[in-house]
Amino acid sequence: KVKDMVPGVNAPPMHPHCRSTTVPYVGNWRDKFFKDRQGKYSVEYDKVLQKLAKDEMTDAIDSGKIKVELNVEKQNRHQLGHQLYEDYKKKNIQKGLPIPSYTILDNSELNSLVLQKASKGHLTTDTNGNWDNKEIINFDKIIGKAYIDGKFIATRWGKVHYSKTGTHIVPRLKEDKQ
């Protein structure tokens, strides 16, 4: 502190005819400047990517490139008790892949949930920022069970896959933005 300074002891010696002053050392301002902004711009970039992906999605829906309605044939591969799910599960076990997640709601209820929640979740993008026709949505009710670490866990989250033939939902544990 300046008030505790004693010339020659903890401050440079003062000369009677010198016009010098002491200034506190504040460190390297560049380090603080960049440290304060670390991570700030990536959040803004993610928001820009989400907006661009949402615009791309609405354009694709309006032009008829993708349909929001549920594709029952694709959804049955994720419907517990259906023959397509059992075949899919058996194929994954033979290949050494994890057991697929499954939905517990019927297709009409899933369809109404998709129509209600479409474009309200997190749209996934590729490395270039282009929308990859998938969206992660919290459906606010248990839609199915995801297979994690050897057991099935009930979940409200689902990844919706959009295509020109319709959508299908794959239950997932949480919103990890993959």
Task: Enumerate the language-model features and the residues they cover.
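Activation/maturation switch segments at domain boundaries
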Residues: K1-K67, I143-Q178
